[in-house]
Amino acid sequence: MALALSDVKRIAHLARIEISDDEAAQTLAQLNNFFSLVEQMQAVDTSGIEPLAHPLSAVRDMVQRLREDVVTESDRRADYQRPAPATEDGLYLVPKVIE
C-alpha cells in the first residue's frame, strides 16, 4: 500500500490540519516508509511460531514480579471537595454553560 500526495493532503484536510506542500511531501515519505515496513513484516511466514505472552519471554525465562494489588491511599474525596463552591453526592457542581 502506498499513499499519494493527494491522500496526505486530504487526510490533513479531514483532520483540520494546515500542512504546507513541503510538510505533506515529508509526511508522505514517512508514511510510505512505514507502510513498506508493515508489508515486509506481513510477508514473513510465522506459521508454527507460538505468540509471545510477553516480550521478555523471548529473551530469557523470566517471571515478572508484580506487587500485590492492595489499596495504598485512603479515600480523601471529602478533603478535596471541602474548598469547592458546590458539591452534591460526591460530585462537583458547575454552572451550566450549554443550553
UniProtKB/Swiss-Prot annotation:
SUPFAM superfamilies: Glu-tRNAGln amidotransferase C subunit. Its EC number is 6.3.5.-. It comes from the Bacteria. Keywords: ATP-binding, Ligase, Nucleotide-binding, Protein biosynthesis. It catalyses: L-glutamyl-tRNA(Gln) + L-glutamine + ATP + H2O = L-glutaminyl-tRNA(Gln) + L-glutamate + ADP + phosphate + H(+); L-aspartyl-tRNA(Asn) + L-glutamine + ATP + H2O = L-asparaginyl-tRNA(Asn) + L-glutamate + ADP + phosphate + 2 H(+). GO terms for molecular function: asparaginyl-tRNA synthase (glutamine-hydrolyzing) activity; ATP binding; glutaminyl-tRNA synthase (glutamine-hydrolyzing) activity. One of its GO terms (biological process) is glutaminyl-tRNAGln biosynthesis via transamidation. Belongs to the GatC family. Allows the formation of correctly charged Asn-tRNA(Asn) or Gln-tRNA(Gln) through the transamidation of misacylated Asp-tRNA(Asn) or Glu-tRNA(Gln) in organisms which lack either or both of asparaginyl-tRNA or glutaminyl-tRNA synthetases. The reaction takes place in the presence of glutamine and ATP through an activated phospho-Asp-tRNA(Asn) or phospho-Glu-tRNA(Gln). This is Aspartyl/glutamyl-tRNA(Asn/Gln) amidotransferase subunit C. The gene is gatC.
